[in-house]
Amino acid sequence: MGREVALLVVAAVAGVAPVARAQATGMPSFNAPYRAFQRSELGAVFSFPDGGGTGFEGAYRYASGTLDVGLRGGIFDPPGSGKAVLLAGLEARERVITHTIDFPLDGALVFGAGAGLVSGGSTLFVPVGLSLGRRVNPQGATISIVPYVQPTVGFVAGSGRTSALKFGFGVGADFRLSRVLDARVSGGLGDHPFTGVSIAAVWVH
């Protein structure tokens, strides 16, 4: 059953136009299929979209049963003389697939809503994606790694632009460095200006 769900969702998102911002605030940051924390986590995220500029965000997540909910906010500093953009968003993740002999990956639905707010050019993002991956514990190592992919469909609307559905394909890895510290890296594949990379340091509780 898990394999069929995964294939259906991937097929659905693959049919949408091939450009998307990855998550609720429009930065190229994606999510592993399961949380690293028991109760909550707090992190700092740095994003570097193609085309220039840097995003600085704080992120907080907390657990609610099988669901975890995240808040993120910060600033995107565009290249040149462009105005700084205020970023704010809400994300949620729900585990929907557990690996089996037939399908070796775990999966979670990742969805949210957020905005990039700036005078005369604000943008709304409503992404929905399926994260697929599996935790790897290298023999003899003290760290563990979760490599994953996240195809994502996003509704994008805003001032001075046509509302549209967009598609993106996220690739990432979460590194458990210690019992309380994660390092994370992810990036979006697609057309300019929606590709880029993101790195994060996260304290888990």
Language-model segments: residues:
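Cleavable N-terminal export/targeting peptides
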Residues: M1-A36
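Exposed, low-complexity/repetitive linear segments and helix-based recognition motifs
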Residues: M1-G2, A88, V171, R179
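Generic detector of solvent-exposed, compositionally biased contiguous segments
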Residues: V5, Q23-F30, P78-R93, A164-G168
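Outer-membrane beta-barrel transmembrane domain signature
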Residues: T25-A36, E41, P49-G52, S64-T66, ...
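Surface-exposed strand-loop-strand hairpins of Gram-negative outer-membrane beta-barrel proteins
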Residues: V45-G58, I75-D77
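Short N-terminal amphipathic alpha-helix/helix-capping patch enriched in small hydrophobics
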Residues: G52-F56, L67, L86
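Mid-chain, structured segments of secreted extracytoplasmic proteins
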Residues: D68-L105
